[in-house]
Amino acid sequence: EFAKSLDSNLNATFFTCSLNAAIEFAHHPSIEVVMIGDKVSKDSMLTTGASAVQTIESIQADLCILGINSLDTQFGLSENDWEVVQIKKAMIKASKKTICIGISEKLNSQQKIKVANLDEIDILITELDPNDPALLPFKHKGLTIY
């Protein structure tokens, strides 16, 4: 959904491991798409693997935009797939800012494997109004909410 919502005048380069995002970005007239990775995780539709992590580690990105599986004010960002976790960790480390996008039912939940502490995330985007009381704990932890 994020890729579909981009301004048609946006001129940018997106490095992505997401097959779905790459397809959407490719339809945009002024976006260059760089697909990273070699092995496809069928559950997440992301490319994963050591070569993907190594490629990401060589990039300096302005923004890291992540879809979330679980986000909790105490445990942080978490996932249940080890290889996806390694990709997301590398992406966060390679970026100046991190944006997490997810539906509200993913909030206040935890998966088995930690990706990042909450203080490594700058912005949270959900379908909720930014002033919704459910988002208040995330604001108190320093996240900007949209």
Q: Each predicted region: which residue ranges?
A:
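Short helix-capping segments at alpha-helix termini
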Residues: 8-10, 28-29
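Conserved phosphate- and dinucleotide-binding cores of soluble alpha/beta proteins
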Residues: 19-146
